[in-house]
Amino acid sequence: MATITPQKGSQSEVGVSNTDPLNWGNAVESLKGSHLEEVKGMVAEYREAVIHVGGGETLTVSKVAAVANQYLQAKVDLSESAREGVDSSCKWIVDNIDKGIPIYGVTTGFGANSNRQTQEGLALQKEMVRFLNCAIFGYQTELSHTLPKSATRAAMLVRVNTLLQGYSGIRFEILEAITKLLNHNVTPILPLRGTITASGDLIPLSYIAALLIGRRNSKAVGPSGESLNAKEAFHLAGVDGGFFELKPKEGLALVNGTAVGSGVASMVLFEANILALLAEVLSAVFAEVMQGKPEFTDHLIHKLKYHPGQIEAAAIMEHILDGSSYVKNAKLQQPDPLQKPRKDRYALVTSPQWLGPQIEIIRFSTKSIEREINSVNDNPLIDVTRNKAVSGGNFQGTPIGVSMDNARLAVASIGKLIFAQFTELANDLYNNGLPSNLSVGRNPSLDYGFKASEVAMAAYCSELQYLANPVTSHVQSTEQHNQDVNSLGLISALKTVEAIEILKLMSSTYLVALCQAIDLRHLEEIFKNTVKNTVSRVALKTLTTEDKEETNPFRFSEEELLKVVDREYVFSYIDDPLNVRYPLMPKLKQVLYEQAHTSVINDKNVSLLVFEKIGAFEDELKSLLPKEVESARVAYENGNPATPNRIKECRSYPLYKFVREELGIRLLTGEKALSPDEEFEKVYTAMCQAKIIDPILECLEDWNGVPIPI
């Protein structure tokens, strides 16, 4: 089997090896280890201040995201060791033109017009850039058709990485110029639409070429968002020597590649990996606040299903629940089996089975895109060692289109699970005692909590499910039927950007709702203790008898009364605990009447006057309980709760702490003027700025990477 040898000065660690000629082994090897460890590695790379390109360095989606991100904008460092290989392919082009050897796109036309011949190589490259500059930007309209700045930066980095490998026939100085633009935050304006990512992303990449040669229609954006022409862009970036006159093949090298699609895909997948991990943690928190049975994470269940994504998702949830104060408390106080279903609903109990395949898809898509961004994907390729130009179809961006379609479906599935969990959480028929809409105000008639938020979540989820439809099934034959199959890679990547944004909207809303539920569980515990203590005191005061000759029918009533309090959901009555339409007071009185009635019938020493004690009990409770409940609520609101919040003893606490302390998000209540959007916006912004990463990882920092032994 022949060895594919990198040309001198080009990248050496990305290619196919003799021992793995089909590269399947390398593909499998890249998926070893846990998804969590891979995400940790991605985060570490994302936070590197300088991204080294060339000289054997492998580009990753996280490195691309770091350079693209407007909040980080890591610097790019070109490896000087790549210069020789890059320049040698450029020299090969010039030498072979002089020999009269025909070379596609250098001495011939393009695509379906490749039968045309020319010896005017410089003019041909110039004309190619001109005719490819055919996009519409809509500068004078409300709707912009401009590629986001971050996506353009990603494309520039990926294109430089490809061209540095020395198979493209372009000068090193041009790559240095693109790098200077990146490092000085000067970004060419590229069109949002117009590419099918089949002969590469020809049209958008042509606008980078247009800026480099100083075309009058080219524009750029400066560090502060200011509009720049080509001359101003070069000056600001410190590119000396004036505009470039493209040599034969250099224009084609710049435009004939998949960098825009794969650059956007890299950004998308970095976020998708983070959001997938977040969904696992949020599902565990959901189990905590829903008082779910933790056995759904038992390793035996998932070991027998074999799927690695499912096994890891379950192990992560198991780890969080194993350290949960909620779970430990539930084991101490087994709930009445009549109060809740024997088995939790699917959104909880099958969350590992649901999330597992999505994680696998996202991981595989990530590796596919990382192969693409490290590939040489223009045409023709210059093989200096064999002294020939080789024409092929590496510009076909099918790995991008397919990976993005698959990843978008996974993102939509994660969103569907989040929506199912959210609707269960907000519905008092299913949420095991939490108030309807997660309302926390004193008067539920004037506090509708997350009611509208659920409607918004339905809208988000519907749009997300629509976006899950494939792009790659909509291919159109074009360019005189030369490009009769095409990947639609960038289109699919941009649709996945939309999907990621919607998932962030959903995750932001859901995270705030979960924190609300955590605090409601805290209030629930405080109120329940308050009610039990008050009932005990009132019973002791009003139901005892001083006559030793008289049998007290209520001598065992306190225990039964407290059982009533334990059985009833606190939020079903706490806004008006003595209201006869609410369950608490009628059931307390029922216990006393039954005991009194039985005693009067069976024991002649019991007087009918015992029924008066029930009235005294009711009157005393009406006098005392509302005051005690309000006092407990005020103490909670003032930061002095009678009972500490259990979340502080949970492994999920870092996420709660991030929301409540770092972002300063408080309980949402109709008693305050604060609207939900003000708080949701804070979480969404934090997600966009990647600030959510550390709290997620802190929830899992002491996980050893393996399930709890069976």
From Swiss-Prot:
Positions bound to (E)-cinnamate: N256, N379, K451, E479, N482
EC number: 4.3.1.24
Family (UniProt): Belongs to the PAL/histidase family.
Record organism: Phaseolus vulgaris (Kidney bean)
Highest taxon listed in the record's lineage: Eukaryota
Subcellular location: Cytoplasm
Example GO biological process: cinnamic acid biosynthetic process
Modified residues (2,3-didehydroalanine (Ser)): S199
Gene Ontology cellular-component terms listed: cytoplasm
Catalytic residue positions: Y104 (proton donor/acceptor)
Name of the protein in question: Phenylalanine ammonia-lyase class 3
Reaction catalysis annotation: L-phenylalanine = (E)-cinnamate + NH4(+)
Post-translational modification note: Contains an active site 4-methylidene-imidazol-5-one (MIO), which is formed autocatalytically by cyclization and dehydration of residues Ala-Ser-Gly.
Chain positions of cross-link 5-imidazolinone (Ala-Gly): A198-G200
Keyword Transferase assigned: no
Any Pfam family hit: Lyase_aromatic
Lineage: Eukaryota, Viridiplantae, Streptophyta, Embryophyta, Tracheophyta
MF annotations from Gene Ontology: phenylalanine ammonia-lyase activity
Metabolic or biological pathway, per its Swiss-Prot or TrEMBL entry: Phenylpropanoid metabolism; trans-cinnamate biosynthesis; trans-cinnamate from L-phenylalanine: step 1/1
Record keywords, A-Z: Cytoplasm, Lyase, Phenylalanine catabolism, Phenylpropanoid metabolism
